[in-house]
């Protein structure tokens, strides 16, 4: 069964500025990407998505790729493959991110989110380092936020 949260019963004490900023940036990037002509959108995705094979061949690709493959470990988290992809990820971030940010503080949450995004990309890399399929989405970062929420608030509804 698919679990789709609509809210949680943990009010946050401070406005979740970083959570809102990540949501805003993801939607701005998605709207830009979504409104590109298909030919340009494909180029945009291949430029900013994480492609494991580019990291495997870093010394060859780093001078040829439009952007350093290490940077795409982060930039890929702000791209999404479609409406359901971004809406699902941002819904989970909206509901659970505020409490995690409240608990960690803004700066630590920012660093935590970016590290989770990088970790998600690296886990995908280690599962198939020769893949030339672009990896996009904030799912690695969202998984980190959800895991943190479960640890911080084990009895929350």
Model features per residue range: what roles?
Residues 1-157:
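A detector for small-residue-rich transmembrane helices and their helix-helix packing motifs
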């Amino acid at each position: 069964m698919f679990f789709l949260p609509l809210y949680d019963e943990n009010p946050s004490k401070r406005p979740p500025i970083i959570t809102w900023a990540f949501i805003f940036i993801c939607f701005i990037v998605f709207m830009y990407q979504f409104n590109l002509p298909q030919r340009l959108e494909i180029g945009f995705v291949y430029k900013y998505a994480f492609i494991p094979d580019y990291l495997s061949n870093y010394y060859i690709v780093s001078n040829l790729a439009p952007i350093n493959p290490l940077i795409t470990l982060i930039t890929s988290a702000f791209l999404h493959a479609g409406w359901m992809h971004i809406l699902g990820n941002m819904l989970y971030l909206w509901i659970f991110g505020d409490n995690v940010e409240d608990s960690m503080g803004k700066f630590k949450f920012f660093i935590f989110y970016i590290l989770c995004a990088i970790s998600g990309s690296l886990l995908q890399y280690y599962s198939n380092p020769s893949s030339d399929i672009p990896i996009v989405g904030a799912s690695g970062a969202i998984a980190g936020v959800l895991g943190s929420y479960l640890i911080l608030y084990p009895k929350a509804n």
